[in-house]
């Protein structure tokens, strides 16, 4: 077996061990790291289009902080709540969970995202409210297009311990979208 495969197997084993021992912390760190990656991807695209622009490390770190402090822990407990009330691994329960997620959690999460990023950016309350008025609905509508399918797969086929990890991997693209929405003026 190649060294790369051995290394990947060891990393996977370590990650799964941490996920079982420290589920919230592991999901928080994973979310933070992947939000950093998402924003870095967006900035890479922006930099390739505008040579005068510079990489904004603080922006990427704000995304990482939000992923770490909000996304990982929030979805750990949210998915746990949904699993408690709809424990069957059935299409019916998956559909119920994704519907509740879209109607309850998604609007709140998108509000938290723009508010949290505004706070981390040092924006005033009025600026945050203006950002919410400008981008919240567009983001939520996009959320309703993207996430139901992902969450159906997540709730129907992914074991509960891996749901946040699966969401985080899918979230690389979504996080890039959020980073772009947040950086738009």
Curated annotation (Swiss-Prot):
Record membrane topology: Multi-pass membrane protein
Keyword Chloroplast attributed: no
What organism does this protein naturally occur in?
A: Dictyostelium discoideum (Social amoeba)
Per UniProt, subcellular location reads as: Membrane
Q: Which GO terms describe its cellular component?
A: cytoplasm; peroxisomal membrane
What is the recorded name of this protein?
Answer: PXMP2/4 family protein 4
**Family statement drawn from the similarity comment of this UniProt entry:** Belongs to the peroxisomal membrane protein PXMP2/4 family.
Question: Which N-terminal stretch is annotated as signal sequence?
Answer: none
* Keywords for the protein's UniProt record, in alphabetical order: Membrane, Transmembrane, Transmembrane helix
Coiled-coil stretches: none
């Amino acid at each position: 077996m190649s060294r790369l495969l051995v290394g990947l197997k060891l990393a996977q084993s370590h990650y799964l061990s941490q996920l079982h021992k420290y589920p919230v912390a592991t999901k928080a760190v994973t979310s933070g790291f992947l939000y950093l990656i998402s924003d870095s991807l967006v900035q890479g695209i922006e930099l390739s289009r505008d040579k005068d622009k510079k990489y904004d490390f603080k922006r990427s770190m704000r995304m990482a902080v939000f992923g770490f402090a909000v996304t990982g822990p929030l979805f750990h407990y949210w998915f746990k709540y949904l699993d408690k009330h709809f424990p069957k691994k059935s299409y019916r329960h998956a559909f119920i969970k994704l519907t509740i997620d879209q109607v309850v959690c998604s609007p709140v999460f998108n509000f938290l995202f723009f508010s949290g990023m505004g706070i981390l950016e040092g924006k005033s309350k009025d600026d945050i409210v203006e950002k919410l008025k400008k981008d919240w609905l567009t983001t939520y509508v996009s959320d309703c297009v993207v996430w139901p399918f992902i969450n159906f797969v997540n709730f129907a086929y992914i074991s509960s311990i891996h749901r946040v990890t699966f969401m985080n991997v899918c979230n690389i693209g979504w996080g890039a979208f959020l980073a772009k929405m947040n950086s738009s003026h």
